[in-house]
From Swiss-Prot:
Organism this protein belongs to: Acetivibrio thermocellus (strain ATCC 27405 / DSM 1237 / JCM 9322 / NBRC 103400 / NCIMB 10682 / NRRL B-4536 / VPI 7372) (Clostridium thermocellum)
Subunit text: Homotetramer.
Amino acids binding ATP: K9, F57, R85, T91, R102, N112
Molecular function per GO: ATP binding; metal ion binding; nucleoside diphosphate kinase activity
Presence of keyword Cytoplasm: yes
GO CC list: cytoplasm
Similarity-based family: Belongs to the NDK family.
Keyword Protein biosynthesis belongs to the record: no
Family annotation (Pfam families): NDK
Catalysis: reaction(s): a 2'-deoxyribonucleoside 5'-diphosphate + ATP = a 2'-deoxyribonucleoside 5'-triphosphate + ADP; a ribonucleoside 5'-diphosphate + ATP = a ribonucleoside 5'-triphosphate + ADP
Descriptive protein name: Nucleoside diphosphate kinase
Function: Major role in the synthesis of nucleoside triphosphates other than ATP. The ATP gamma phosphate is transferred to the NDP beta phosphate via a ping-pong mechanism, using a phosphorylated active-site intermediate.
Active-site residue numbers: H115 (pros-phosphohistidine intermediate)
Length: 136
């Protein structure tokens, strides 16, 4: 069964959307294999976003993801990566369609509520990054 990593970012937690978002995944019959609330430190944030380290928004992104607690989870299911990304919507809240998580709840260009792995390869890397205890 395919796995993916999902991060409910600080604005999801602050706005009390965690239960609603998790409920959407459960209604699609995805299994929550692992879930935890944590604070992401700068080192972990820089590692996670290293692919955009040369972009002008990098420091703002790091400040945002480290600004408060996040909920990190591993979901499994049939074609879960593709399905979750479809449920999440476009990266920009303004480009996300109604019915998607970002389309329904997003209101800020930069604070976009949620991260979801974009491929099997990145999912496995991200799962090891945020759940290193599972790698033994």
């Amino acid at each position: 069964m395919e796995r993916t990593l999902v991060i409910l970012k600080p604005d999801s937690v602050k706005r009390k959307l965690v239960g609603e978002i998790i409920s959407r995944f459960e209604k699609r019959n995805f299994t929550i294999l692992h879930l935890k609330m944590m604070n992401i430190d700068r080192e972990l944030a820089c590692e996670h976003y290293s692919h955009v380290k040369d972009k002008p928004f990098f420091n703002d992104m790091i400040d945002y993801i480290t600004s408060g607690p996040v909920v990190v989870m591993v979901l499994s299911g049939y074609r879960v990566i593709e399905a979750v990304r479809s449920m999440v919507g476009a990266t920009s809240n303004f480009d996300s369609k109604p019915g998607t998580i970002r389309g329904d709840y997003g209101y800020h260009r930069f604070e976009n509520l949620i991260h979801a792995s974009d491929s099997c390869e990145s999912a496995e890397i991200e799962i090891k990054r945020f759940f290193p205890e599972l790698d033994s």
